[in-house]
């Protein structure tokens, strides 16, 4: 197969798989079941998908007793989890049941906090298109690719609460060993 054939095959298969993940994440009931099974801490923290497409994802995290710290703001680890999820759902949309099979892994996370989170916080990542290109590059070259996503957390007034950079590694799995 030519490189073009491999990418065309990936895109054809992934358009259905990506749409399936977007539907799952858009259904509150199915999303909660997914969290309970695969990400129970996100379920406990009550992270919610506010918006998801193949280009962007917005995750909300409430300010409540289980998420707060002793300083009466949302605990940084909960904010970090929401930030990672806003990028991770986009990545999952592009690697879920991919042909060829692709692994994804967070290799770095950087966060800066600009304001106390004392209410609901929304994390939005708009890196879906660029992320897809990085994944396609991993397929074309058969070499691991890293991609650095930006996600911005804002409060209900639109003020920036936090800025995160999540670095993902994408690698085509070896079909013989499954790794």
Predicted regions and their residues:
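Short structured motifs
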Residues: 43-48, 107-113, 134-136
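Short Pro/Gly-enriched beta-strand edge/turn motifs at strand-loop
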Residues: 27-36, 41-42, 132-134
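Hot-dog-fold acyl-thioester-processing enzymes
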Residues: 66-88, 101
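HotDog/MaoC-like acyl-thioester-processing domains
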Residues: 1-23, 117-118, 128-179
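Catalytic strand-loop segment that frames the active site of acyl-thioester-processing enzymes
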Residues: 44-74
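Hydrophobic beta-strand-centered segment that forms part of the acyl-chain substrate-binding groove
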Residues: 90-129
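Residues located in well-ordered beta-strands
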Residues: 48, 110-112, 124-126, 150-152, ...
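A generic structural signal for short beta-strands and their flanking turns/coil linkers
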Residues: 45, 55-57, 100-109, 119-121, ...
